[in-house]
UniProtKB/Swiss-Prot annotation:
The keyword Cytoplasm applies. GO terms for molecular function: thiazole synthase activity. GO terms for biological process: thiamine diphosphate biosynthetic process. It comes from Corynebacterium efficiens (strain DSM 44549 / YS-314 / AJ 12310 / JCM 11189 / NBRC 100395). Gene3D superfamilies: Aldolase class I. It comes from the Bacteria. It holds the Pfam family ThiG. This is Thiazole synthase. The active site is at residue 95. SUPFAM superfamilies: ThiG-like.
Length: 259
């Protein structure tokens, strides 16, 4: 079970909607993933949208929408966007993103911390997209974030987890859920995140931009479960030298042979 603030989810996989080629494909992928929580950029919300919107789809599938502040460059913009989301969708949950520049899409952690502190004071349940810096993650927890979401690598790159040591360090020190966010390229990346101690994984491009989104969504679902089970099972320690899995007792020797 994944518990964030006052909500509990069976699935540890959080999906994003960005990059989906069609509503039909998005629906199939979401169902295949088994997700119960899905992020949507607030700029995709429009009261005059014709046909079924992303929010209508999530409501029909009984998936909790998690509005995010994607595209915001300052704390002020993020706070305004979060308040608009609360008014439009009736939720105080928000994934806070404050991007430093359009080339790297890396978080501006100074603006991010300011935005999160302001939103927590306003009664929001804040999930913060951040760098893989353990000090920043601790600071976000200190200001009241309900979850920290360190990146594995830059958004959309599919490079996987570039600094597994930092991710594991964040997980070992956190008192709130740690959700790997950004950089996942394939199922093994998601499994590794869970093996490192993450409580969940958020991904979008890895599914929505691959050759077979439905198959990849299903793979991610199993990968997250496998990684979580492996973490709980406890891996064997890494060793410099080989250790035989079977003993040498009972092996025939030259002296045992009858000539």
């Amino acid at each position: 079970m994944l518990t964030i603030a006052d909500r509990t989810f069976d699935s540890h996989l959080i999906m994003g909607t960005g990059g989906a080629t069609s509503m039909a494909m998005l629906e199939e992928s979401l169902v295949a993933s088994g997700t119960e929580l899905t992020t949507v950029a607030m700029r995709r919300h429009a009261a005059t949208t014709t046909g079924e919107s992303v929010f209508d789809l999530l409501r029909r599938l009984d998936i909790t929408p998690l509005p995010n502040t994607a595209g915001c460059r300052t704390a002020r913009d993020a706070v305004i966007t979060a308040k608009l989301a609360r008014e439009a969708l009736g939720t105080n949950w928000v994934k806070v993103e404050v991007i430093a520049d359009e080339h790297t899409l890396l978080p501006d952690v100074v603006e991010l911390i300011d935005a999160c502190e302001l939103l927590v004071a306003e009664g929001f349940v804040v999930l913060a997209y951040t760098s893989d810096d353990p000090v920043v993650a601790r600071r976000l927890e200190d200001v009241g974030c309900a979850a920290v979401m360190p990146l594995g690598s830059p958004i959309g790159t599919g490079l996987g987890i570039l600094n597994p040591h930092n991710i594991e360090l964040i997980c070992s020190r956190a008192g709130v859920p740690v959700l790997l966010d950004a950089g996942v390229g394939t199922a093994s990346d998601a499994a590794l995140a869970m093996e490192l101690g993450c409580d969940g994984v958020l991904l979008a491009s890895a599914v929505n931009r691959c050759q077979d989104p439905v198959a990849m969504a299903r793979a991610m679902r199993y990968a997250v479960d496998a990684g979580r089970l492996a973490r709980g099972a406890g891996r064997i320690p890494k060793r410099e030298h080989a250790v035989a899995s079977s003993t040498f007792d009972g092996l025939a020797s030259w002296s045992d042979q009858v000539l």
